[in-house]
Amino acid sequence: MMQTVLAKIVADKAIWVEARKQQQPLASFQNEVQPSTRHFYDALQGARTAFILECKKASPSKGVICDDFDPARIAAIYKHYASAISVLTDEKYFQGSFDFLPIVSQIAPQPILCKDFIIDPYQIYLARYYQADACLLMLSVLDDEQYRQLAAVAHSLKMGVLTEVSNEEELERAIALGAKVVGINNRDLRDLSIDLNRTRELAPKLGHNVTVISESGINTYAQVRELSHFADGFLIGSALMAHDDLHAAVRRVLLGENKVCGLTRGQDAKAAYDAGAIYGGLIFVATSPRCVNVEQAQEVMAAAPLQYVGVFRNHDIADVLDKAKVLSLVAVQLHGNEDQLYIDTLREALPAHVAIWKALSVGETLPARELQHVDKYVLDNGQGGSGQRFDWSLLNGQSLGNVLLAGGLGADNCVEAAQTGCAGLDFNSAVESQPGIKDARLLASVFQTLRAY
């Protein structure tokens, strides 16, 4: 039995459909509906994990997620990363619209999925008329006969169907109904709770001829890497929509929160950004072969829209504050013996939006991460720049959501590093041709390796 949130949404949807039929009768546009030429099923095939990225302004569980919602801007970013793009068209609960479909379709070449509570063939014709290439059919909402009828309409228009299940009974029905792409919703639409175990438990019951998509509650690279053993792809919306920097938000989930440190040239910053990095590191430590001054840093920054982090070691606080301000750094990374008093003083004087990162040297044991006002830790072997790794087995069982891993990371070991569960990786010497000179091919290779799952 459907109850609560879902039942209310479906009851309201029936009212909406009848009103829309009056306003825009099927007969007024059915002759103009052309079959889709973008193949949803094919787009999700292939060796790499697929990503259906979602345009979503609001949801019943979170309210408004994205204030300045602009489907054209979102599509222009998603088209660089997505296998398919999902567009919420439900008005009442998600502040969606069918008008968003052609906007997204015009900008992005990928198949467009109409995400709605579909209960009537009319909605599928409407979706295709507005340029959707696939539609969502939810087995929590439809009985088998309704599903067959709606799927047949979609397939007659050469549209794909994402068949959504949320429990074992619906999964068995999806198998019996011959669903080609099954979305396992980790959110229980009856009470809106999230349980990622649903993907782990249900996905293995589906055959190899079925494409499995894990939906809801996916918001980190560590989750994606782990769940990619169970699912062929992911549908991700809320985790992306809440961020101002959408490029960085997508990269964070697909590749991790990765940084390329020791940038000294604009072309290297561009190569790092093009490869998939989020952060660029600028080193202000005089003894480093990668040290830059403010003018050099500005040249580097002008070349690529990375989020820039300044690296300092036992600097005067006034110097750190000055560079953070002049360069609009997103974070300052402390590599010396800065203690709690130093960090407290710095925090009080820094603008609130500038984060404090602390590098810790790992020897025989893992140092404590108990400093106040530290937003991220960078775990390295020694003082950094050594090109050597520490014993990563020390990270087993640790909570690493605010940790970047550093020390000799390159294409040969970045996957093993990512599998530790750290938020991201910090690349430097192993992506260089000589100290301070990055190699664009090595950078590209590292990020291609990180995305090969």
Curated annotation (Swiss-Prot):
Presence of keyword Translocase: no
Pathway: Amino-acid biosynthesis; L-tryptophan biosynthesis; L-tryptophan from chorismate: step 3/5; Amino-acid biosynthesis; L-tryptophan biosynthesis; L-tryptophan from chorismate: step 4/5
Keywords for this protein: Amino-acid biosynthesis, Aromatic amino acid biosynthesis, Decarboxylase, Isomerase, Lyase, Multifunctional enzyme, Tryptophan biosynthesis
Subunit organization: Monomer.
Protein name: Tryptophan biosynthesis protein TrpCF
Gene behind the chain: trpC
Stretches the record annotates as N-(5'-phosphoribosyl)anthranilate isomerase: 258-453
Gene Ontology terms describing biological process: L-tryptophan biosynthetic process
Organism: Escherichia coli O157:H7
Single GO molecular function: indole-3-glycerol-phosphate synthase activity
